[in-house]
């Protein structure tokens, strides 16, 4: 069974834990030493000071979480170990690699407490094999990747140009802006693709 390290309290990230458990993997929080992959999950905004900016649109900041996740992300990067970032996790990973963020964008945050759904496009073989060149995903964020971190390349975009997924050119690092764990199993939706296919493919590839 593959073990996935999460820096935090597993009870706060039940959707992730349940989705990976359904795929035969375990999310653990005690030690990253023997884990097969690091998971950087969704959550509040990364403090702009970590990418050299003042606060202009960031909110809900938790600097202690930022520091802990940046430290473990940079450790896994230095050791060339697999990382999966989801939503905030994609943004934090970009910052860990020296990139910056758009502190506020319109049209991607929830409406009446529910995730938006929008189309995304790709020419990347990983995604086209799973879902085709255009498909629908959920959306629940108000920040996004701006200047790319070192070694990252975009592989999926929303129609407005927002970067929806990145992959590292040489390291086993992959991240998405949407929430696949909220598009599968008990949270499967008829208006998006099945997020389980993506999570299973990441477990296999990374």
Summary of predicted features, one role per range:
Residues 1-88, 95-96, 102, 106-126, ...:
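N-terminal beta1-alpha1 cap of cysteine-dependent amidohydrolase-like domains
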Residues 139:
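Short, basic/aromatic recognition patches
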Residues 174-178:
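Active-site-proximal beta-strand elements of phosphoester/diester hydrolases
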């Amino acid at each position: 069974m593959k073990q996935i390290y999460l820096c935090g309290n597993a009870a706060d990230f039940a959707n992730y834990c349940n989705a990976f458990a359904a795929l035969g993997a375990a999310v653990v929080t005690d030690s990253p030493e023997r884990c097969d992959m690091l998971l950087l999950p969704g959550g509040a905004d990364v403090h702009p000071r970590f990418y050299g900016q003042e606060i202009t649109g960031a909110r809900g900041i938790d600097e202690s979480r930022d520091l802990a996740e940046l430290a473990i992300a940079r450790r896994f990067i230095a050791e060339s170990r697999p990382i999966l970032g989801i939503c905030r996790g994609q943004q934090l990973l970009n910052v860990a690699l020296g990139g910056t963020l758009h502190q506020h964008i319109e049209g991607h945050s929830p409406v009446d407490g529910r995730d938006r759904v929008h189309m995304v496009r790709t020419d990347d073989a990983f995604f086209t094999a799973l879902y085709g060149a255009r498909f629908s995903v959920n959306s629940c964020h108000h920040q996004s990747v701006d200047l790319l971190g070192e070694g990252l390349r975009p592989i999926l975009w929303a129609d407005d140009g927002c970067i929806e997924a990145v992959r590292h050119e040489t390291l086993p690092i992959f991240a998405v802006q949407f929430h696949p764990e909220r598009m599968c199993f008990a949270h499967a939706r008829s208006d998006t693709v099945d997020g389980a296919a993506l999570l299973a493919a990441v477990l296999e590839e990374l």
